[in-house]
Every structure is written in C-alpha cells, then in structure tokens.
UniProtKB/Swiss-Prot annotation:
This is 3-hydroxyacyl-[acyl-carrier-protein] dehydratase FabZ. Gene3D superfamilies: Hotdog Thioesterase (3.10.129.10). Its main location: cytoplasm. Transmembrane segments: none annotated. Belongs to the thioester dehydratase family. FabZ subfamily. Its EC number is 4.2.1.59. It comes from Vibrio cholerae serotype O1 (strain ATCC 39315 / El Tor Inaba N16961). The keyword DNA-binding does not apply. SUPFAM superfamilies: Thioesterase/thiol ester dehydrase-isomerase. InterPro entries: FabA_FabZ (IPR013114), FabZ (IPR010084), HotDog_dom_sf (IPR029069).
Length: 153
C-alpha cells in the first residue's frame, strides 16, 4: 500500500484550520502525523465521549457514527489535495465528490484514537481519486475509495 518516508512531515491543528473550512464540532482531523505530497497522508482523530453526536448515537452504548469516519477520510483527502495541488484560488474549494466501496469492520467508541490514512491514486480534469483506510490500534475499522473535486463556488 503506502511507502512511508523516514523524514516525517506533520501538521498541527493551526495549519489544518488554515487549509480546511471545517470547525468544531465538524473538524475531524486533530493532527497530521505524516504526509508526502502526491502520495499519502496520515491523520489522527481523538474520539472523546464529550462530542455532541454521542448524546444520541447511542446514549446507552456510544458508537462513533460511520458517516463521520468517512467525513474524517474526506477531510484527510482535502488536506492531501492542498499539499499536492496547492491552495485553490479565492473562488474555489475542494469538494467531496463521491465515495465508493465503503466498508465498516469494527465499531469506534469514545477513548479510541482513529488513524486515517489516505493514498493519492490519480487526478483527471480536476477530480482526484484516493484510497482511504481508518484504523484503531492497528486494526482496520473502515475502508473506502474517495474522490474530491476542485471547483469554483
């Protein structure tokens, strides 16, 4: 799958917020632990019981919603797109375009640390294709193929 570099490039929350428009409670990447432009990005999401989705999903047995795992993958692809293709023009954004072959293998619960790994596959006419895998303690909890598109708004 991914070949990791020995010299790690990272991003803290300040740099992530400078690239993504999302904010709490919808900013789902807390830190980037490694990336290489045009190749891969590894992001981290600390799952806390204090997050608002746990009041209703599910009060007796809190489970991090699968759709939010996919959103974390989409945000990671956006970060990798910025690092690979540069910042969009003032009237452009990277949009989440599609998801295919999403599979959920294990539940994610409060206290888990979600590692989101995305790999750039190809780009054509402003649409980029990525593979995504989310892991907890090294075990795959979700995988999918994602596309993001650079478009004017």
């Amino acid at each position: 799958m991914m070949t990791l570099t020995t010299d790690k490039k990272t991003m803290n929350i300040t740099e992530i917020q400078s690239l993504l428009p999302h904010r709490y409670p919808f900013l789902l990447i807390d830190r980037v632990t490694d990336y290489e432009e045009g190749k891969y990005l590894i992001g981290l999401k600390n799952v806390s019981v204090n997050e608002p989705q746990f009041t209703g999903h599910f009060p007796q047995l809190p489970v991090f919603p699968g759709v939010l795992i996919l959103e974390a993958m989409a945000q990671a692809t956006g970060l990798l797109a910025f690092k690979t293709f540069g910042a969009p023009k003032e009237n452009e954004l990277y949009y989440f375009a599609s998801i295919d072959e999403a599979k959920f293998r294990k539940p994610v619960t409060p206290g888990d640390q979600l590692m989101v790994e995305v790999e750039f596959l190809k780009e054509r006419r402003g649409i980029a294709l990525f593979n995504g895998v989310a892991k907890v303690d090294g075990d795959v909890v979700c995988s999918a193929q994602l596309k993001c598109a650079r478009r004017e708004f």
